[in-house]
Amino acid sequence: EATVMYIHWGNEYETVENQRQRDIAQKLCDLGFDVIVGGHAHVVQPMALLESTVDPDHKTVCIYSMGNAVSNQRTGVSDQFPPGYTEDGALFTVTFEKYSDGKVYVSGTDVVPTWVNMHSNKGAREYNILPLTKDTEQQWQASYELTDQQFKSCQKSYDRTMGIVGEGLEACQTYLAQAKEAREEYYYNLAYNPELLETEATEAPAAEETT
């Protein structure tokens, strides 16, 4: 099985996680959680690949905050906090794979930035949550029927979110891709070349016993 924790934490309107979030996340990683999904800050916060301090083979994918899905907070809640970020959200996806021995692994993750387009439609206030993928950027304006200003707001929103999660997302994706490649080689050998695994096990150094 795989374990996912969805947690309500962090300081509102801060685009960087606080130390308490980091401490809790590390503890959850050490306990064996595979994925941590955070919320509450009303802004997007970074992603991170956490390494267990008790199991050298275990790592945890963490996004500290997915921001706002639907928001009436436009340019900022006060002069203390940066404008625009409360309009942003993140569609966070995780892919799991189950193997023949019943074990489940996290095999991939991704983030699609979203922007809340609050506008007037026939005198009524309307909210549209717009998913923003870079490869379709040139279609945003036509697909979502945006004004030039709204299109620019979409671009700014995308840049804000990827500026926050991009580094951590890349680290997670790189590790998961490498782990999957190694894992599939292992399972292939398990199915078709079991003698190779037996040889490796025989040649592996014995564990040191302590009393």
Question: Could you describe each region identified by the protein language model?
Answer:
Residues 8-12, 42, 67-69, 114:
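Active-site beta-loop-alpha junctions enriched in small/polar residues
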Residues 19-92:
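Conserved beta-sheet core of the metallophosphoesterase superfamily
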Residues 75-209:
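A short C-terminal boundary segment appended to hydrolase-like catalytic domains
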